[in-house]
Amino acid sequence: MRVSKYLLSTQKETPANAEVVSHQLMLRAGMIRRNASGLYSWLPSGLRVLRKVEAIVREEMNNAGAVEILMPMVQPADLWVETGRWDKFGPELLRFQDRHNRDFVLGPTHEEVITDIIRKEVSSYKQLPLNLYQIQTKFRDEVRPRFGVMRSREFLMKDAYSFHLDQETMDDTYQAMYTAYSNILGRMGLAFRPVLADTGSIGGSMSHEFHVLANSGEDLIAYSTESDYAANIEKAEAPMPTEPRGAATMEMSVIDTPNAKTIEELVEQHGIAIEKTIKTIIVKGASEEAPLVAVIVRGDHELNEVKVEKLDAVLAPFEMAGEAEIRDALGAGPGSLGPVGMTIPVYVDHSVNVMSDFAAGANQDGKHYVGINWERDLPQAEVADLRNVIEGEPSPCGKGTIGLLRGIEVGHIFQLGTNYSKAMGASVLDENGKAQTLLMGCYGVGVSRIVAAAIEQNHDDRGIIWPAAIAPFKVGILPMNMHKSHRIKDMAEKLYSDLSDAGIEVLFDDRKERPGVMFADMELIGLPHVIVIGERNIDNGVFEYKNRRTGEKQEIPFEEIVDFIKSAK
């Protein structure tokens, strides 16, 4: 491809509204352009990368025995009413009516549509198991789209759905998808980690996420230092306390804390050890009888909202209570709350349950209790795992300790069970002629998100460093002052022709530009290999080659260059 015939819209300056590196570089490299909040057009370089990601995903899905279909982006609301998600899904589900006042949604996911297809098309156990997938645009009306295509409203996704009569074939397909996802990310040259995950709003039992490792990742991954255990921090089980509750050595008393609104201020101003403090958080309850619930973790621990949401007494999805609600119910603000005399249901983390002589808010503004002890000063509360794990703690697998990594989720696989098939009456006749509700699996890959994640993992201060498998072009040709030298022009044209004839994807910079601009653009867009042609090269019978990732430079004889680039990784 000649740059003169190509839309290479690079920018020198970093856009002010781009928060993360991938968003900045995708804009600067001319890969995408914003049309509206969370909506982007893909320009030629971006689309070339997107199509390469899509091709690898498609190949590995086909290799795993899945069959491609295509479902509509617009879905009838009736299907969502059947599963109950019409009411459960929040405002991220874009709803609209056609000219006949019929309700529709712009699909954020396709469980309802695929289940409707299967219940109409599959009637016998002989047609199972079946694994169908599509690569389709999705839309989720995110409250705050950000990070470019990392969290956009419209995005490209591969979603697959499998149907089974028994758990054995469900497990087999799940493992096949696990392997396929590992192959997909491995072929793209990305460092990644599969992790145990929460099933979230889609529901189901078994679930794994696939994370591209990057320091900028939003997700925290807990892993064992001595086994292959890895889990999203939302899912990782905190270890049980190894020491029993200590005996009381203090009497409970009230202290004035007018300027201590946070745990840190309480510790700093009053000399209390942070491990002797607790955080009391008020969340929305699941019942009218208990509209508010108190959940408590130790002062140096972080509340795990996903774990809290799984408590029967807590409203799902998780929602913090507002200050006005809290004051109306408890008589004090969030910085002065504690379990002593609490009139709403109380759940404490295992680590809080073994505390003694601890400090907490007194449910009066500007006052705290110190020397609190369970059973003496307040009744035993409900106990559960409510916190995030901490680096260095024993791993839940029993081997090694917990380490923490940051990752970007690009894939998620679920065993859904009968959540959707039961709601929609998707069943088949088994060998005995008896109707059996189908087991379902669900497997998603964020195709457009992988592009951004790859950049987050592969860049430097000059631009993108594409892994070869998904680079927009394999090699760039940079002829120095080609328009002033027939020798350079002729050699560049011949090299372009030879490489193209060999099936190599080439970007030939034939612009009338200064060499500095050409070099900067080539490094910004991140092609793995660059060939420079100047007068000295022609005199010496060699091309100057540069590897984008390593920065290594070599002189390659004219006659060897095609084979060299073909074999370059």
Swiss-Prot record:
Q: Which domain of life is it from?
A: Bacteria
**For this protein, what is the EC number?**
6.1.1.15
Q: What sections of the protein cross the membrane?
A: none
Q: Does the keyword Repeat apply?
A: no
Which compartments does it reside in?
Answer: Cytoplasm
- Catalysed transformations (reactions): tRNA(Pro) + L-proline + ATP = L-prolyl-tRNA(Pro) + AMP + diphosphate
Mention one GO biological process in which this protein takes part, according to its record: prolyl-tRNA aminoacylation
- Pfam families per the UniProt record, alphabetical: HGTP_anticodon, tRNA-synt_2b, tRNA_edit
Which UniProt keywords are present, listed alphabetically?
Aminoacyl-tRNA synthetase, ATP-binding, Cytoplasm, Ligase, Nucleotide-binding, Protein biosynthesis
Entry keyword Zinc: no
User: Which Gene Ontology MF annotations are present?
Assistant: aminoacyl-tRNA deacylase activity; ATP binding; proline-tRNA ligase activity
InterPro entries hit by this protein: aa-tRNA-synt_IIb, aa-tRNA-synth_II, aa-tRNA-synth_II/BPL/LPL, Anticodon-bd, Anticodon-bd_dom_sf, Pro-tRNA-ligase_IIa, Pro-tRNA-synth_IIa_bac-type, Pro-tRNA-Synthase_IIa_type1
Q: What does this protein do?
A: Catalyzes the attachment of proline to tRNA(Pro) in a two-step reaction: proline is first activated by ATP to form Pro-AMP and then transferred to the acceptor end of tRNA(Pro). As ProRS can inadvertently accommodate and process non-cognate amino acids such as alanine and cysteine, to avoid such errors it has two additional distinct editing activities against alanine. One activity is designated as 'pretransfer' editing and involves the tRNA(Pro)-independent hydrolysis of activated Ala-AMP.
Summary of subunit composition and partner proteins:
Homodimer.
NCBIfam families found in the cross-reference section: PRK09194.1, proS_fam_II
Q: Which family does it belong to?
A: Belongs to the class-II aminoacyl-tRNA synthetase family. ProS type 1 subfamily.
- The protein's name is Proline--tRNA ligase
Q: Which organism is it from?
A: Shewanella loihica (strain ATCC BAA-1088 / PV-4)
Name of the gene encoding the protein in the UniProt record: proS
